[in-house]
Amino acid sequence: MEMYRIRLGVYFLLAALLNFSCKPSSTDSELATPGSFILQESELPDYEKDLDHKGLLTALDDRYDESIRTGEHIYNNVCFNCHGNPDQLGSIPTAFKFWEDTFNLGKDPYSIYQVLTRGYGSMPPQVHLTPVEKYDIINYLREAYLKEKNPGQFFEIDSTYLAGLPSGSNKGPAPKEFKPWAEMDYGNFLINTYELVGKGAPEREQSKGPSPLADENLIDANFAYKGIAVRVDQGVGGVAAGKAWMMFDHDLMRVAGAWTGEGFIDWEAILFNGKHNISPRTVGNLHFENPVAPGWANPANGKFEDPRFQARDKRKFGPLPRTWAQYQGLYQFKDQVILSYTVGSTKVLESFGMESWQNQPVFTRTLNLSPTAKPLKMRIAQDKTAVALIGKGAILKKENGFMVMETMPSAPVQVKILIGSAGTKGLTDYAKSSAPPASLAVLTIGGPSRFPKKLSSQVTMGTQEGPFQVDLMNPPFDSPWKNQFRLSGLDFFKDPNKGVICSTDGDVWLVEGFTQNTGKLTWQRIASGLFQPLGIKVVNEQIFVTCRDQLVKLHDLNGDRETDFYEAFNTDHQVTDHFHEFAMGLQVDKEGNFYYAKSARHAREALVPQHGTLIKVSKDGQKTEIIATGFRAANGVCINPDGTFIVTDQEGHWNPMNRINWVKKGEFYGNMFSFNPPKDSTEAGMEQPLVWVERDRDQSPSELLWVESKKWGALNGKLLNLSYGYGKVFVVPFEKIGDQVQGGIFELPIPRFSTGVMRGRFNPGDGQLYLAGLSAWGSTQPQLGGLYRIRKVDQPMVIPVGIAATTTGMKLTFTDKLDSKAVQKISSYSVKTWDLIRSRKYGSKHHNEQTLQVTKAELDASGKTINLTIPSIQPTWGMEITYKVKDSRGIEREGLVQNTIHQLGSKTP
C-alpha cells in the first residue's frame, strides 16, 4: 500500500504551490536570503528542527516507484492547476515552469525542501505537507521535468552531498488522508453547482491549448447550476455524511435527480479540494434524473420550451421569467428542508424525503399548492421511472417521454409523489401503505435550534510599536461541526458589540463581544449551506448575503437568532459551471440599492452577459442592472462619496498587472474575454485604472473602503485597499485630473496577516477597523481564516495620504509634519518607472525600466507636502518612489509609494 494517501486538502497552497519566482523582480535579489523566508526556523514544528534529511533522501531509492506515483499524483491534482505542464499552461502562467526556468535559492533537493517548508516570495509555506510528501514532490519534479527537459537545474546527488545533509532523529509524521471539506457538517442542504452522473460516467471533457480555451460540448451534461443538494436519509453530520440525496435546481424549479452511495460528491472544486476548471460530480447510484429544462410548464401555455438566454455553446443560463416561476427561498425545520417557489400566481411549498420498498429507496416529493386558476403541469421523471401519487388535486400522466403531474384548478393541492428507479415493481401497491402527504405550512414558522452550542474564542491584544495595534480575534477552529472558518465578509448591527460574519464554506455567524473588551468573542452559527458567500451587509438590522446563486435575506422566525427562512431576495444571477465566476462583496447605496461584482471566466471568453461585471440590485430585489463591464476577477465593491465605485481586478489575460478601478456607469474596464467587449482592444478602448498595482506590492487586491472614524485622525476620510494576496492593508492616495483618477498605494506599517484579507468594516462603536480574511486560492498567507482588529493608537503616523503628478515632478502629502532639512536631501529619494504590455497573454513583464533623477526636494508651507523636482517625468504605467526623511521630531521615516501616472497636472507652485 502506498505510504502516501493523497491529501487534496492542502487548500491554501493550491494556487501558489512551488511558485519559485523564476523571473525575478527588482526586489528578488533582496529576498534571496534565508532571513527572507516567510517562516523563520523558530516558527517551524519541532520535528522539522531534528529531521533526518539524509535518511529521507536515501529512502527514495527503496520506494522509488511509490514516490514517483505519489509526487505525480500531487502534481497532477494540485500543482498542475497553476503550473501546468510543457503542453498546457497553468492558471497562473507566471508560475515557475520546472521544465525551463531557473531556481533562485538552489537546485539541490534540500534547498527546494526549505522553500517548500518555509515559504518564499509569493509562495506560502506548505505547512500541511509532511516531509515524506515534500520529498516525493521533489523526486517527481526531478525525474519528470528537470533531468531531461531542464538538465541545467538537475542536481546530482552523491555521497559527498548526502554526508553534508542534516541527519536528525526523525522523519516527521506519517502522511495521512486529510479532507476537511468532506468532513465538515454543512447542515442538511448545500447549494453549489453540481453535475449529476451515474456510475460509469465518461471522463469530464476539458479543453486544452492556448487561451482563450475552447468551449467544451456540454450540452448533454446534467448540470444543476443552482443546485440545492438535500440529504434525505437520517443521521448526524449533515449532507456530506449522508447516504441518499435529492437535488433541486432553483433556476428551473426542477428536481435534477436523486442518488445514493458513499461520499455525496467527488469534491472536485476550487473551494473544496482546490482543483481549478472543474465542478463537483455526484458519486454513487443515480436513481433518476431530469434534463436541464423547466420543471414546470409555462402556466400561460402549458409548454416546457426553455425561453432563457442561450450562450455561445448552446447551453441556457439564468432563472426562468418571474411570470413563469420564481424561487422564493427555503425554510428549515429540524433536519427538514422546505422549498418555497411560485408557478405563475400559484404558491408552492415542497419537501423531499425517502422511504423504502423491497429494500430499494423510494424518493418522495411532498407538494402543497395554493388554488390555481387553470391546470399546471410538472415533470417528475422520464417515463421509464417508477412513479406513484398520493393525495388529491392532481393526476399522473405520460407526456412526451416523461411522467407528468397535472393539477386540477380551483382547489388547493396536497400530494406526495413516490419515485423509484426504473424497473421498481409494485410502487402503486406500496403507495397504499405510505403515509399521506403532510401539510408543510406548519414547518414554516421556525423550529428548534439546529446549532445550539455557542462557541467562544480568545482575543489576543496587539503589542506592536507604532501608530497601529493589531488584535487577533481568531475564530473557534475546534468547532464541533468542523467548520473551516474561511471568513469572507463582516458587518455590524446598531449594537456595535454584535456583528455577522460569513464564510466561503456556506456559514453565517453571529458574533458578540467586539466592544465589551472581555478578551473573548462568542460565536453562534445562524446559517449554513449557502453557495460561496463572499459578501454580507446589515440593512435596517436585517442580514443580506451575497452568494454565487442569489442575494439571500436571512429571517429568524422564532427568536432563537438562527435562520429559519432563507429568502431568495434576488435570483437574477447567471451561473455557469466555471470555477472562477465568484460573486464578490456587498454594499448598499443611500437609496437602498445593493451592489456586488461578478467575475469572468478564467482563460475563457464569457458565456453570459453578467461575466465580468459590476451589478446593481434594486432596493426591493425585483430588478438587476449591469453597471460596468470588462472585469476579470473583481474582488468586491466600494461605493464612493460621489456615487461612483471602486472595483479591484487581478493580473491575468488582458490585465498586465493588478488594477484598482475607479468605476463609472456604462464603462468598460479592459478584459476582452468578458461578454461583448468593444472592438477596440487597445488602451483607448477601455477605462484606465487608478493604479496598476505591481505584483511585488500586492499579488491580489481585494476590497477597498473609506476610513469612517475620527479615531483614525488624519486618515479619516481617506481610502484603504485590502490585500488578499499578501495579507496587507494599504492607504490609497489619489488625485483627479479631468475625468481621470490616478494615484498609488502605500503599505500601512503593520505586520502581514496570517490570511489574505478579504473584507473590512469600521465598527461604529469603537471606531476601529475590523477585517475578515481567508486563504483559499492564490494567497501567500497560509492560515485558513482569520478575524482581526486594527486599532489606531496615540502615535504619529507620518504616512503619505496625498499624491500629485505635475509637469515638474511629484508631490507627496503626509499625515504629519516633516523636518525641512531632511526633506531637502535629494539622495534620500529614488524614482523608478516602467511600462507594461496589455495583451491576451497572462500578465506582463516590466518594459522600458528607467531610473529618474530627482534634482530638488523641498517642503511646502504646511510642512506636510514634499515637492520633488523630476525633470524627465512623463506619464507611466508604473512608478515607484522610495524616500527616507525625518518627521518634525527628528525621527527617521522611510517608505515606498507605488503609483501610476496617466496625466501630468499643473506645475508645482
Predicted regions and their residues:
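Flexible coil segments in periplasmic/lumen-exposed cytochrome c-class electron-transfer proteins
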Residues: A32, D50-T58, D65, N76, ...
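The canonical Cys-X-X-Cys-His
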Residues: G71-P86, I137-L141, L787
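Gly/Gly-Pro-rich "capping" loops immediately C-terminal to redox-active cysteine motifs
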Residues: E72, G84-Q114
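Detector for the c-type heme attachment site
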Residues: C82-Q88, N104, T117, V127, ...
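Beta-strand-rich N-terminal accessory domains
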Residues: I157-T364, A381, I395
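Beta-propeller domains with acidic blade repeats across secreted/periplasmic ectodomains
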Residues: P437-M797, V801-K811, S820
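N-terminal non-catalytic regions of secreted/periplasmic and cell-surface proteins
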Residues: I790-D835, V897-P909
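Short, surface-exposed alpha-helix to beta-strand junction/turn motifs within ectodomains of secreted
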Residues: K817-K856, I881-D887, G895-T900
